[in-house]
Amino acid sequence: MESAFTKEHSWSIISSFFEQKGLVRQQLDSFDQFVKTKMQEVINESPVIIVQSAPTAGIETQKRIAVRFGQIYVSKPPVYTESDGRTITVFPNEARIRDLTYASPLFIDVTKETLSELGVVDKHKYSRVPFGSLPVMLRSSYCVLYGLGDKDLIDLGECPYDQGGYFIVNGSEKVIVAQERMASNTVYVFKKAQPATYTHYAEIRSVPEKSSRNPSTLSMKLCRSPGVIRVSLPLVKQDVPLFVLYRALGFLSDKEIIDHILYEDDEEMFELLKESIEEGTVVQDQNVALDYIGKRSAPIGTPQEKRIVMAKDLLAKEVLPHIGTQEFCETKKAYFIGYIVQRLLLVALGRRNPDDRDHYGKKRMDLSGPLLASLFRTLFKKLCVDTTRHMQKCIENGREFNIALGLKASIITQGFRYALATGNWGDQAKAMQTRAGVAQVLNRYNFVSTLSHLRRVNTPIEKEGKLAAPRQLHNTHWGMVCPAETPEGQACGLVKNLSLMAYISVGSSSGPLVEFLEECGVESLEEISTSQLDAATKIFVNGVWVGIHSDPVGLIKSLKLLRRSLEMDKEVSIVRDIREKEIRVQSDAGRPCRPLLVVKDNKLVITAEDIRKLKRGEIKWDNLVTSGFIEFLDVEEEEMSMIAMNTKILADESRNSSDVSVSYTHCEIHPALILGICASTIPFPDHNQSPRNTYQSAMGKQAMGIYATNFLLRMDTLSNILFYPQKPLVTTKSMEYLRFKELPSGQNALVAIACYSGYNQEDSIIMNQSAIDRGLFRSFFYRTYTDQESMSRPGVNEEFCKPSRGAVLRMKNLNYNKLDDDGLISPGTRVTGDDVLIGKITPILDPERSTKEAPVYVYKDSSTAMRRTETGIVDTVIVTNKDGYKFSKVKVRSGRIPQMGDKFASRHAQKGTIGITLRQEDMPFTSEGIVPDIIINPHAIPSRMTIGHLIECLLGKVSAMSGEEGDATPFSGVTVDGISSRLKSYGFQQRGLEVMYNGMTGRKLRAQMFFGPTYYQRLKHMVDDKIHARARGPLQILTRQPVEGRSRDGGLRFGEMERDCIISHGASAFLKERLMDVSDAYSCYVCDFCGLLAMGGSKVNECKGCNNTTNVSMVEIPYAFKLLIQELMGMNIAPRIRFEE
């Protein structure tokens, strides 16, 4: 069978995965789950709103009103209410063009009850009360586009390759980036960095499964001297001794407590507990222990009985709430605290290593579902508070309470919109506490950059932190996170990208799991004696210790069978930790997992026949999972599995006759799947030095190509389109799923590696001007300008028109002649900088001629002009309406021809700018008359070790001759010798060298050139967007120095380092010229006696400080220095300028 299973079979399986799942499934599933279940859960958690009138004299009965919320409904499809009140179905493309929000209205059932002392007097149910609107994720099951075929998508103006997974808010596409966090309900034990009062500490962040309240953190410290264990509880100001906590839970005798911690006679552990036992002897009674906790948590002056009640409540609700928040959970909590103590002591005794914070199994990713749920909870609370306030007012004023008016739907609508539009996740009022950058504008530079953005994972740590550990690549990232794709600089290693087949679990309830475990004979902690614990295996479900079992092997077997037969969710992870005698079952959301082939007796369970069925379309990916051929493992379970890298290893092992045999449980589908989106487009990444792959992953996002097939219909602020994008000659198998061949971003250029003239030194390249003239690497650049008529004051609106110089005030020094009478420019007009594209006038009140009764308005110009540095042709003009006002967008296109200074790069981060363009007749040529398009310098190769670049060139040559794509998928066993022999069979020199002739002289060159087709990308950094110079120009108001930046016509900064260079040259006159004369020279007067600033001029010379009216000198100093002197004077420091005689 193994011999029958080939690499091709692997790719058939992978294709079926992407056919069914796509690349943004994790976003869509998470959003769907939020709408289907999480929203209703938030509503169900909320308490009933009860309001009662204040008691008034003479009236005995108080009026009480209760409002409860019921079922919530999301309408499909998304709609928009026009200014005239009509409701229309809104399609995504219309939302983008008209700057609308693509959102569905929410409705909710509300029950209003009027109560008296006797009970409910009157009950009324209002069904489907408007409840705001929710932005809808594109291609989720609530989107108009869900399930449509390619033809229908094209009719709606959508790109059929677009996979959705983002929102449209105010016309801009927003993606929610996954946020990484530590897993809750897990015990972590760490060593404390010394010096400190304690040596080790254990902590657990506890969150109950269904609620999303803030985590309650319990931490346990092993103190240095004396060696006592103290526990820090939530809301308790001081640490509580361990045994006092146990007595507060109702366990009084030392023996009883120790039985809950140690299950066997362990001398060393008992020694470590001795000090704690002695510290606890002072408190022997439960109430005394509760009062000990109460005193340290209740406000000062609380009576003792109340303190004890408060402490009991705190132990129930705040201590390990994930185990239970009701009464009668004390036994479970006592056992769990004992488990934490045991873990702490094991680490302290050196029998177990401290936990690793960066282990990926201990991380969770919050996708749009959990993030929107926490936002919705905040907004819903706000709405409840607002509704309560409204009801209270109504009752006090004796008005009837109207549900439709009382529910302020705009709270929900505006809250969602604000969070998605700004990326500040949380309440607008508390903007300082919120997380920034959760929602980002979707990167649409090219198709790969879009996909990559939808699979990004962010770690919310301060980017300034110098900690290396969280940024490093961890062993557990294998297959979950791309090892290459991460930004350089500040966010390096903190912003990650998911690997190709990684998926993030959406989570399922633990209820059915616990029921099944009970059926399988798991004994509950309440029913067992402590003596049983020593030999038994502990069973944890989502961090809750549910019981023990005596036959772990059997239990694991039946659990895995259940998962493979799909009676249990396929995302559930089942981990057996043999050394610690634990079985951990996890079903929570946010665990990254990936598919692997199941292996039984060192043979794959899947057969060649199954793959043939898959190819014929008789079965799909889901059938492979349900048949138990493939299963999803998360990091924790993967660590407890034995995974073969490929089927060859399995075959070798099954033939192995030696005594030492390895029993594999799973097999990788293909090792190339450890890479993410961007790294998957690199040919032979396994032959490059690793940082080169990282650089290319960043540059691939800046390459021009076609970002969407509907780019002509879209009105993006900025976009670049390559004229003739080509699919690469040398491809990887993964590109097929990234649609790189359909929407490429580059061209196959003929590249020679040689020193030819000196114009390709230091990473510059020589490009063939004749090839550029034929259209090589030409591109279009589109920019969209937007404007809207709006209300300047009630009843007076702005207006699109062609402003005339006499009638309109404050007209800028621009060209208004190209506008039509309606104030808009017509398509096809050639425009340059300072041409007006949209003419608009704004009415302002004329204070001289207006009276209160008859206001008189004059108009000022507020037109939109082209950017000063750009030229182009008007491509499209649209006029539509938004909120009842005219709204216009103008798209201007300009052609960009490669020229000196433009940046290009191969797919191996070999980037360079054009140093010179030579015409075809000046370029070197081969005996067949073939001329290179690009010549790069040989010095670019050795130090960078991008061998992949050379192999790509070699394989590209073979592809061009054979007419089939070259396969450069990593880890696929392609060898240079194999390619060389094929190249030789086509009659070329086997290592890709060519005899060339000098284009200038026609003589044969002594050296041969390495020459062949290589895929090159044109990057967005173009010299036309950067070229800048200035003589005189605008100044800053405060310092009177030139302003900064090309767009403001700013100066060029002469910085500290430049200053140091000129000082070391000793060129003082030049230094004075740069730093003062041409920057901010200023003449002022200084008193000769006291050296302070004085008044001076033709009429008066006077120093107020020392009443000197005769000796005042004029000095020339930088204005910034004058400013500094005055600021120091304002701080009561007197800087005096002294003159040499």
Curated annotation (Swiss-Prot):
Zn(2+) binds at residues 1087, 1090, 1103, 1106. Mg(2+) binds at residue 763. It comes from the Eukaryota. GO terms for cellular component: DNA-directed RNA polymerase complex; mitochondrion; nucleus. Keywords: DNA-directed RNA polymerase, Magnesium, Metal-binding, Nucleotidyltransferase, Nucleus, Transcription, Transferase, Zinc, Zinc-finger. It is found in: Nucleus. GO terms for molecular function: DNA binding; DNA-directed RNA polymerase activity; ribonucleoside binding; zinc ion binding. A zinc finger (C4-type) spans 1087-1106. GO terms for biological process: DNA-templated transcription. Pfam families: RNA_pol_Rpb2_1, RNA_pol_Rpb2_2, RNA_pol_Rpb2_3, RNA_pol_Rpb2_4, RNA_pol_Rpb2_5, RNA_pol_Rpb2_6, RNA_pol_Rpb2_7. Its EC number is 2.7.7.6. PROSITE patterns: RNA_POL_BETA (PS01166). It catalyses: RNA(n) + a ribonucleoside 5'-triphosphate = RNA(n+1) + diphosphate. Its main location: nucleus. DNA-dependent RNA polymerase catalyzes the transcription of DNA into RNA using the four ribonucleoside triphosphates as substrates. Second largest component of RNA polymerase II which synthesizes mRNA precursors and many functional non-coding RNAs. Proposed to contribute to the polymerase catalytic activity and forms the polymerase active center together with the largest subunit. Pol II is the central component of the basal RNA polymerase II transcription machinery. It is composed of mobile elements that move relative to each other. The binding of ribonucleoside triphosphate to the RNA polymerase II transcribing complex probably involves a two-step mechanism. The initial binding seems to occur at the entry (E) site and involves a magnesium ion coordinated by three conserved aspartate residues of the two largest RNA Pol II subunits. Belongs to the RNA polymerase beta chain family. Component of the RNA polymerase II (Pol II) complex consisting of 12 subunits. This is DNA-directed RNA polymerase II subunit RPB2. It comes from Encephalitozoon cuniculi (strain GB-M1). The lineage of its organism: Eukaryota, Fungi, Fungi incertae sedis, Microsporidia, Unikaryonidae. The gene is RPB2.
